[in-house]
């Protein structure tokens, strides 16, 4: 019988890097799965030690993970995922739910490497999953049903927000949210450096910049306002904010940000075609 949301689950990880650890940590801390019910594999002990510290089981055998876990999350590097899927394909059954968090590997590619009727889902996470504040999207393959999608979504919400989308949105999510973490960090750095230029100590400036981003994000989420409305709430005629915004517009801030998301998305689409 396939796993359902009410059944005990063993969750497997093939690949034990930072994203795999972040997801495992979120699942365990949220009580979605017991640490002893998590089994992770990797070629070496370099990353497995982090799983052991969580109380998880570890192995160097990918086959062992598939043999013991009905739900397996593949968190390998994208360039090695096809080889790994081909390796485990002989022991994949219709009882398995196969999940990939590797960028650039399409559902059709995974389905083509695995036995017919394999239930496959694809997840695009981002780095804040490490602190259980991730922004994730997921897409399902041809044979993954509603129960499979609900099960995975329920699990991953331990790591942040998880929304089911058409697969065509996954590469866009990579540009918006996967790469977007770096874009936001660049803005936070520049924000702080502006204050440093005006005489504020570096450590204080970076703390305030980060808190400003955090507080603004919470207001956008909790109040449900469009960013333009919240921005307008800060403006006063001839005040400091409108002068600062004018400087941003002169520098092409809005267009540069849109172009960054576009460039990252286009690159993600290129990688998906390889």
From Swiss-Prot:
Keyword entries, A-Z: Acetylation, Amino-acid biosynthesis, Cytoplasm, NADP, Oxidoreductase, Proline biosynthesis
Pathway: Amino-acid biosynthesis; L-proline biosynthesis; L-proline from L-glutamate 5-semialdehyde: step 1/1
Compartments in which it is found: Cytoplasm
Domain of life: Eukaryota
GO molecular function: cytidine deaminase activity; identical protein binding; pyrroline-5-carboxylate reductase activity
Keyword Oxidoreductase appears in the UniProt entry: yes
Reactions listed under catalytic activity: L-proline + NADP(+) = (S)-1-pyrroline-5-carboxylate + NADPH + 2 H(+); L-proline + NAD(+) = (S)-1-pyrroline-5-carboxylate + NADH + 2 H(+)
Post-translational modification N-acetylalanine, affected residues: 2
Gene Ontology terms describing biological process: cytidine deamination; L-proline biosynthetic process
Gene Ontology cellular component list: cytosol; intercellular bridge; mitotic spindle
EC nos: 1.5.1.2
Pfam family, one: F420_oxidored
Quaternary data: Homodecamer; composed of 5 homodimers.
Function, in words: Oxidoreductase that catalyzes the last step in proline biosynthesis, which corresponds to the reduction of pyrroline-5-carboxylate (P5C) to L-proline using NAD(P)H. Proline is synthesized from either glutamate or ornithine; both are converted to P5C, and then to proline via pyrroline-5-carboxylate reductases (PYCRs). PYCR3 is exclusively linked to the biosynthesis of proline from ornithine.
HAMAP family: P5C_reductase
Family: Belongs to the pyrroline-5-carboxylate reductase family.
Name used for this protein in its record: Pyrroline-5-carboxylate reductase 3
Organism: Mus musculus (Mouse)
Name of the coding gene: Pycr3
């Amino acid at each position: 019988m396939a796993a359902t949301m009410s059944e005990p689950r063993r969750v497997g990880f093939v690949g034990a890097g930072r994203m795999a650890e972040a997801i495992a940590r979120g699942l365990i801390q949220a009580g979605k799965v017991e640490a002893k019910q998590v089994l992770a594999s990797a070629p070496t002990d370099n990353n497995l030690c982090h799983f052991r510290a969580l109380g998880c089981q570890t192995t160097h055998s990918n086959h062992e993970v598939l043999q013991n876990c009905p739900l397996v999350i593949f968190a390998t590097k994208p360039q090695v995922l096809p080889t790994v899927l081909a390796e485990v394909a002989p022991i994949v059954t219709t009882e398995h739910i196969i999940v990939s968090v590797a960028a650039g590997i399409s559902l059709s590619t995974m389905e083509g490497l695995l036995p017919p009727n394999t239930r496959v889902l694809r997840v695009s996470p981002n780095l804040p999953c490490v602190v259980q504040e991730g922004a994730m999207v997921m897409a399902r393959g041809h044979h993954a049903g509603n129960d499979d999608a609900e099960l995975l979504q329920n699990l991953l919400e331990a790591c942040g927000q998880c929304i089911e989308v058409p697969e065509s949105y996954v590469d866009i999510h990579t540009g918006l949210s996967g790469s977007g973490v770096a874009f936001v960090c660049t803005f936070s750095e520049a924000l702080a450096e502006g204050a440093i230029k005006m005489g504020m100590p570096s450590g204080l400036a970076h703390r305030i910049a980060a808190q400003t981003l955090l507080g603004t994000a919470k207001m956008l989420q909790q109040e449900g306002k469009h960013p333009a409305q919240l921005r307008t709430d800060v403006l006063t005629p001839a005040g400091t904010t409108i002068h600062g915004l004018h400087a941003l517009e002169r520098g092409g801030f809005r267009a540069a940000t849109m172009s960054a998301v576009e460039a990252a998305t286009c690159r993600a689409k290129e990688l998906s075609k390889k």
